[in-house]
Amino acid sequence: GGGSLFAYAFTFLAALAVTFILTPAVKNFAVQIGAVDKPDARKVHHGLVPRLGGLAIYAGFMVSVILTVGFTYEMTGIMIGATCLVFVGIADDIVSLPAKVKLLGQILSAAVLVIFFDVNIDWIDLPYMGIIEFPLFISVPLTIFWIIGFINTVNLIDGLDGLAAGIATIASIAIAFLAFQMGQWISAAAMVAMTGACLGFLQYNFNPAKIFMGDTGSMFLGYVIAAVSVMGSMKTAAAAVLIVPLVALAVPITDTVLAIVRRRQSGVPIFSPDKNHLHHRLLAAGLSQKQVVLVMYALTAFFSAAALLVVRLNPFLGVAVILLTLGVFIFWAKKLGVMREVVLPPTEKDEK
């Protein structure tokens, strides 16, 4: 099929409806099997909230993509890899997997796509530099790293009601818009489906949340956004397709990088939870949970718009705007105390 507006509307509504209808059922299921979120050091939540909501997002996305795109070679790879990752997420939401096991699951899920379905960043056409080709021994690890980076970035911001789902929605719209403009209807349809699924879920996940997406959801979102952008980059090799998701998620990516630097400096494990992420610092600065989420949405929308301007209009101007904004952003993040020393909170194991 082509990319008629009717087709996109159907893709969007199918994902939205399936996720919206299934979320209450997933919620009951999560409660029954004990996949509930207990408040801990990183959480700002009180009381038990069911996890696993990502299952409903996954279902909405899959049903919509299968109905509209079908099983094209690359999309099949993305769906298989995402399904592997969803199983890792479910296990993690039920029993809390060790960080190393989770990382291994992420690597394998990415490898399925990159190795068996050849979805990788094998060449890129950079403005002013021309075409750069990567040999397999670079493109395969590079693409796996790219996917894992997005998985963990979205995973990291899933700390406040509606935060990850809303940010993923905005980023998905930006990627869909670019793909649509470049005539890549499969990438566009996939991101439109993701937008619908996230919005269907947000109805239940916005503050005060009745359900969390859990790692099932956040890892799935990161995976699909990363994988679809790689799939798109293979068609055109324009750097644009990779720049948009990077810049759209500039805030959480910067937050992730700062978190890793902060933890290395403090000598604690990279994946250990702490409360120094930007959203925690904004809460500490006196904003309500809802206000913090809206500030993060606004930042994401701003960066997404900037990214689209960059790649459609003037690369130099856009890059300047983005670097300037990032500079201001990092300055404020430091001022808010994002880089403070990490003091590890007592873990659940210590309390038992």
Which residues fall in each region the model found?
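Membrane-interfacial loop-to-helix junctions in multi-pass transporters
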Residues: 133-143, 188
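Membrane-embedded alpha-helical core segments of multi-pass
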Residues: 83-88, 105-117, 142-155, 168-174, ...
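Juxtamembrane helix-capping/reentrant segments at transmembrane boundaries
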Residues: 38-50, 210
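Transmembrane alpha-helix boundary signature
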Residues: 63-73, 91-97, 114-129
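Membrane interface segments of multi-pass transport proteins and intramembrane proteases
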Residues: 30, 34-35, 93-98, 124-134, ...
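Alpha-helical transmembrane segments
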Residues: 1-29, 33-34, 59-87, 163-352
